[in-house]
Amino acid sequence: GASYGYDEINLNVGCPSKKVRSGNFGVFLMKDIKLLSSCLRAMKKNLSIPLTVKCRIGVDEYEGDEFLNNFISSLLNEGIDTFFIHARKAISGLDTKRNRSIPPLKYESVYRVKENHPDLKIIINGGIDEMIKCQNHLSYVDGVMLGRKI
């Protein structure tokens, strides 16, 4: 990583695209924490720069605060301390575009992750299209990730 000029590697386990699902990576990895942990361990072992994770608040039947907190806690064991969290779950069967609009946004779920893990760096993502929304989110989390123009 660093030898190529990168200062951080972010593993996106929040991508719901059909291609990603068929390859058992992306959001699929949120359903297989053992495999994800193994991947992160191998990556961490070979990196001298920070490794972060982008995820969703859930995927299909894997949802709710308990799932998300268990997911985050499991990755803490692998030394991950920065999370980019898309504030909606992914739904299999929806294309990527519809996965950005049909599942409802649940910003409070991301805020609760920060409340439960104040030492983690939590960056919120999803449906943020105005500067005022960015400013509001920063009252609850450490950063805002924009995927679209504002």
What are the language-model segments listed below?
Residues G1-I150:
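Flavin-dependent oxidoreductase catalytic cores
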